[in-house]
Amino acid sequence: MLQMPKLNEIPPGRGGPGEPWGEGRWAGPTGPEAARPARGARGQARGARARWDSWEHSRLPTHPGPGWDQCSPSFLCAPSSQKLIMESKDEVSDSDSGIILQSGPDSPVSPMKELTNAVRKQQRALEARLEACLEELRRLCLREAELTGTLPAEYPLKPGEKAPKVRRRIGAAYKLDEWALHREDPLSSLERQLALQLQITEAARRLCAEENLSRQARRQRKHAALQEEKKLRDLQRCLGDRRRNSEPPPTTVPSLGRELSASDDSSLSDGLLLEEEDSQAPKPPPESPAPPSRPLPPQSLEGLQPTGPESGGQERAPIQNSPWKETSLDHPYEKPRKSSELSSESSSPATTPQDQPNPSSLWVLDAASYHVVPIRNVPGQRQGRTSAPATPEMQGRRGQSQSLRVDSFRAGAEGRGRSAFPRRRPTHYTVTVPDSCFTPGKPPLPHPACHSCSEDSGSDVSSISHPTSPGSSSPDISFLRPLCLPEPPRHRGAWGPACGRELAPHYSKLLLPAGYFPTGRYVMVAEGHLPPGEWELCRAAVGAAYDEEGAPLRYQRLVPSHSRIVRTPSLKDSPAGRGLSKAAVSEELKWWHERARLRSSRPHSLDRQGAFRVRSLPPGRESFGRASGPRTQVPPVYVLRRSTDGAPVQVFVPENGEIISQV
């Protein structure tokens, strides 16, 4: 057995660094009396040791020995309330008990002390890092408080510390969206929950379908799958109810909005039929749209396949119903066109300036006998620009309703927007004009213009339609009654822009040449029975229509008109065309040959305001058309006063609002 030394004995090898190993180490008296002189002798031999009074207190020597400079104190003095941390490898002793301890590699307490020191060092590092993070958080919270004026709740407070008062910085005042910060859209929340529930339900089904399961596990998984499917159905039902409740009630405004978003290729008769259906029955919700009585025409040349009724409303038209912008004038004429451009090329955004009201308003004339004025489109129109033929209206809808579709009149720059109503591509039409337009006693009233929007409608003023006869796919035109306005100074005639294809009777049996109607953008406004040589070209702004009381004419029921536009491929197809005189036919042929002789190339686009190419003007009228090149534009002027010989003395330019007088 190992013999442990007694308390007051010095173990072997502990005699000090100056004592050699020998036989007499264990000999001699033992006890505190013998150990104390030995320790004193070792202290005197070293001379560099501090003199110890007790275990916890030490004093530096009053007279350091010669080896004091090379030695350093090996003990740390701590307060009496803390333990002494021993960091020296040398031996220490307790003067009271006589215990001699050594902190060396062979000591059993050394690994524990080292671990304690390492843990305490790591703790101090973590505390420093935490303090740095808290300081950064305080700084960020103070910056946020300077912007919002409110100290965030995340501001870290020390024990006993009060929250600082922060005032909002000048120039940082703004209002946060409380709804976006503290609330969320219930529909989006339900949609997210539904998407998550779909995944959970699918996972539960896969777990239930696994093989090699015990009967109890299979039963539990099947029950869980049924519960998830029930939650999924509840979410779907709740989402459907919320969507139905959030939609606005069906009114007449949504029906008009659907017509406004229709494509430019849709025909006017189709749009009017949809309007009548919407006025008779409320609009169903978008989730389950009711199919109309007949399908809509194709929205583009590419999609000639059957489409649903929502294709016109869901998909935007090739040309949106946006206000006209000046940047559209920068596009070149010979630009290669895509299919969407081909399908909406003839709808021009800037052909009907409505900047100010004008006496040349719309008219309604009583119907009587008629003269046939065949009007043709420009021969240079592309074949690919024609849309699908309009579907004839049903027989049962004849005479049910006559609607006047009038958008709100816009003034200023907003008056240049695109027409929000459907447009029809140019085709061959014959216009029947009542004889009441031409009273036998005096020339017609100023600017009696037939109003029709059956073709390219570039205006937001109005679109008038009446039920057509069987076999006719074109809507009727109506004539508005003339107003009791003072007659302006009479002039010989003027060309003016129309709301879509406006066709005016020139005189009783005159056939207009096709070159004077470039895709229905201009109209001859005649004031007397004048030969074509006396015609003049100018632009007259068409103002808002007014009724007899002077109020703007917006929505009213018109009396059934007996005049209409019918589709006629040639003159012989029209019954009234057979009675035309040979002189009228010869006049038309003469003008046709004149155009063919002087024609060099056809205009490619009429998207510019006033882009009307003047091929030939009568003698003496060349000043109105600036025929300076292949793209001559007619200046938009309105003749206010003339001299006795017929020369214009005072003209009005609607484009910039100037009145030009000749001195």
Curated annotation (Swiss-Prot):
Q: Where is the composition biased (Polar residues)?
A: 349-361
Q: Which residues form a coiled coil?
A: 117-147
Motif range for Nuclear localization signal (NLS) 3? Answer: 422-428
Q: Which residue ranges does the record annotate as region Disordered?
A: 1-73, 219-363, 375-405, 448-483
Q: What happens when the gene is disrupted?
A: After infection with Citrobacter rodentium, mutants show significantly increased bacterial loads at day 5 compared to wild-types. They are able to control the infection by day 12 post-infection, they exhibit significantly shortened colon length. They don't have impaired cytokine response. Mutants also exhibit impaired recovery from dextran sodium sulfate-induces colitis, they show increased body weight loss and reduced colon length.
Q: Where is the composition biased (Basic and acidic residues)?
A: 50-59, 225-246, 327-340
* Localization (cell): Nucleus; Cytoplasm
Stretches of Low complexity bias are at 23-47, 259-272, 455-475
Question: Where, by residue number, is the motif Nuclear localization signal (NLS) 2?
Answer: 332-338
Biased composition annotated in UniProt, kind: Pro residues: 282-298
Any Gene Ontology CC annotation: cytoplasm
> What binding partners and quaternary form does the record give?
Interacts with IRAK1, NOD2 and RIPK2; the interaction takes place upon PRR stimulation. Interacts with YWHAQ/14-3-3T; the interaction increases upon PRR stimulation and is required for cellular signaling pathway activation and cytokine secretion. Interacts (via N-terminal domain) with CYTH1 and CYTH2 (via their N-terminal domains). Interacts with FBXW11 and BTRC; associates with SCF E3 ubiquitin-protein ligase complexes.
What this chain does, per the entry, is described as: Expressed in peripheral macrophages and intestinal myeloid-derived cells, is required for optimal PRR (pattern recognition receptor)-induced signaling, cytokine secretion, and bacterial clearance. Upon stimulation of a broad range of PRRs (pattern recognition receptor) such as NOD2 or TLR2, TLR3, TLR4, TLR5, TLR7 and TLR9, associates with YWHAQ/14-3-3T, which in turn leads to the recruitment and activation of MAP kinases and NF-kappa-B signaling complexes that amplifies PRR-induced downstream signals and cytokine secretion.
Put simply, this protein is called Innate immunity activator protein
